[in-house]
Amino acid sequence: MSFSPLKGIRVLDLTSVVVGPVCTWRLGQYGAEIIKIESPDGDLMRGLGGLSPTGQHSGTYLHLNRGKRNICLDLKKADTRDILDRLIASADVIVANMRPQALKKLALDSETIRGKFPDKVYCLITGYGTEGPYSGQPTYDSVVQGVTGMTGLFLRRDGSPSYVPMLICDHVAGEIAAGAILAAMMERNNTGVGSSIEVPMFETMAAFVLQEHMAQQSFEPPVGPAGDLRLLSPQNKPVETADGWIAFTINTNAQVRAFLSVTGRESLLEDERFNSVSARAKNVVEWFQVRGAPLKNKTSEQWLELLQGADIAAQPCHTLETLAQDKHLKSVGLIDHEQHPTEGKTAVIRASIKVDEQYLLPREFAQPKGWETAQLLKELGYSENEVNTMIGNGSALVASS
């Protein structure tokens, strides 16, 4: 039996792009029914996330919108208000990532919805929250990377700022929002009362950065400069071998001794600069020059055999082209394939969580825009004639055949 603790919970998904879809995707992995409301223009990520056979289901969109029932509504049309009201009444959780002022205009804000339905769990994911001088400003992942100082970490280490080439802020904030919703559902089970949750991306990621890099500035008076000097070392990077690069980390005294022995640097075993955790912290620059030095006298495979044999955490540095072919990922079946109704054969990335010795099963394919519009309208109590009228006047749209 599949692990589905949220079975019977309906989530109304008013989100788009990445951060919100990550949140609702996670809830869907736990068995919740996700109803994704999409505008006639469609979720921006359908095209923005890369090329696809039809131009309507980028890889990113496919992977983050699995298991969601898609209804397409033109919220500018007056008769969609009743549809929204019925959807809200039927839902347990509402998730939105529009700007607060836009939600207020559509009467889709937490105050309005929970004023009518105090048992609802409402989660708003924003760039900057509903307070403070940045509130209401637009943002995207790269902007959050900049304003949180993530780009400044590269400036400090490499001499120029850079973005992490992943939508890391969206993914982190989305997962945190999902966790907050799960906690709110536990509270509702105990009290019968819902919650209004707010997850601002800026504060969320600023806290992540500061938890690691406030470092010596965490004390009054400070005991040193800001920044984890290990992580900010220019030598803290993959190490070059005879035929590529490998990644490894050595932290404990036992790991350091094993590393120095395996790499033929036994002369440093008694060096007082490196013979304890505190000594290496005081001499972090010199230590990282040692551990970051190239290992070009052997191939990556040879070094990995030696390092792993010494119980040192070490693995190859994959490229985007080689990652999916990793022997471990292939063995555990992280990636599979299925037939999509409009895109043909597509990759399926299952959830990485294992419960009671079983991985969570992948949900259904990401649906074309309006795929279940008619079906959901009927489930909400509209007659066949009413459904046809709403489709005919453009209030509701169905997927093209």
For every predicted segment, state its role:
Residues M1-N190, P368, A374-S401:
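N-terminal helix-loop segment corresponding to the beta1-alpha1 unit
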Residues M1-R10, G224, P234, E240-T241, ...:
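Terminal low-complexity tails and localization/encapsulation signals of metabolic enzymes
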Residues I34, Q308-T322, S383-N388:
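Short, well-structured beta-strand/strand-turn elements
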Residues D41, Y128-G129, M201-A206, D243-W245, ...:
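Glycine-rich beta-alpha junction loops
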Residues D74, A96, V199, F248-I250:
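Active-site-adjacent beta-strand anchor residues
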Residues T130, D158-M166, N189-M205, G224-L231, ...:
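Conserved Rossmann-fold dehydrogenase catalytic segment
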Residues L155, G174-G194, A207-Q217, L260-E266:
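Oxidoreductase and adenylate-handling cofactor-binding alpha/beta cores
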Residues L229-R230, P234-A310, A314, S400:
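Aromatic-enriched alpha-helical interface/lid elements that frame and gate functional surfaces
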